[in-house]
Amino acid sequence: MTRIAFWDVSGGHGTPTLVYHLAHMFADQGRRPLLLDLDPSSRLTAMCVSEERLARLWWTDNDDRTIFRYLQGMLPSSSSPPEAKIEELRPGLGLVPGNLSLAFFEELLATMWTRAEDPDAIAVLSVLHRATSLAEQTHTADIVLMNLGPGLGAINRAALLAADYVITPLAPDLTSVAGLHLLGRRLSTWRATWQARATSPPGQLRPLGYIITTPAMALSRRPHAQHWQDQIPGTFRLTFLRISEPATDPSADPWCLGLMRYHPGLRTLAREARRPMFHLRPGDGAIGAQMTAVVRCREDFDRLARTILTRAAELATS
């Protein structure tokens, strides 16, 4: 079983969309993926369920299957451990929905980080690890995809401690390259601090690689985008791996898990049809050139999903 966190510094790189499509592709490939929406904005959850269902999840007390309820019941101060419930999106694909109230944990987790020699603080900081373990056992998941919100906050830090690997979604722009410097340094600091204090979860925070979503307009027509894309491989190695190497073409970089197309037209159709882009049908409006794009999109995500699994298997034995 593999846990993978998807984390970027500033948002706007389509991380919920990426995670949503990967989960459906893993299910198409016969796996049992589990989605954890750990972003308080809950954008991934909003993609997965209807607005009516989302309202019931947030406001019906006896339907306590959001990540907020999981964490509440697992705090050391709680007297009633949560009942494991998974939102089944389709056969084999489960979701632990997000909740806006998750933001209330930010201050608690930040405070506990400063007291991490205290066993009670360790128990609080590892609450996401225990919640993930409960959810993955309930769903009998073989891969967990953790959707993190943007930024360097305490919720993301606790989520990364619960993950086996970290994938960084990027765009070919200045923000992504600058963000790599922030994420890489912070990841290294958090790893060293945690491993000096505790052994469970192990807190390896291992980078698995990065994914670049290219803009709808060709890079040849956006010279600045091409410039920043070429900076990503060297910057990733320097900041995440502490290896100083010159920049190279991302398509030749083993740490680049995929160069993904944006598909703006398909995104609109998929949002209206409430299905992945590569599941769109003519009845959803995917006709002519759009249907060709659907096939290409499916090929891209199939290749990306297999590359992620291969890379995780390689790192697990290294």
Residue ranges and their predicted role:
Residues T199-S318:
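C-terminal lobe/tail of nucleotide-utilizing enzymes
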Residues S41-L95:
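Phosphate-binding loop that captures ATP/GTP phosphates
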Residues T2-P40:
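Walker A/P-loop phosphate-binding motif and the immediately C-terminal alpha-helix
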Residues I4, D28-Q29, H129-R242:
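Conserved catalytic-core segment of NTP-binding enzymes
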Residues L75, S79-K85, L89, G94-M146, ...:
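Cytosolic-facing regulatory segments adjacent to core modules
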Residues D63-A84, S188-R206, I243-A252:
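Short mixed-charge
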Residues H21, M25, M47, A158:
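Active-site signature of alpha/beta-hydrolase-fold catalytic machinery across serine-
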Residues T15, E117-L128, T175-L180, A293-F301, ...:
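Phosphate/oxyanion-binding active-site loops and adjacent basic polyanion-contact surfaces
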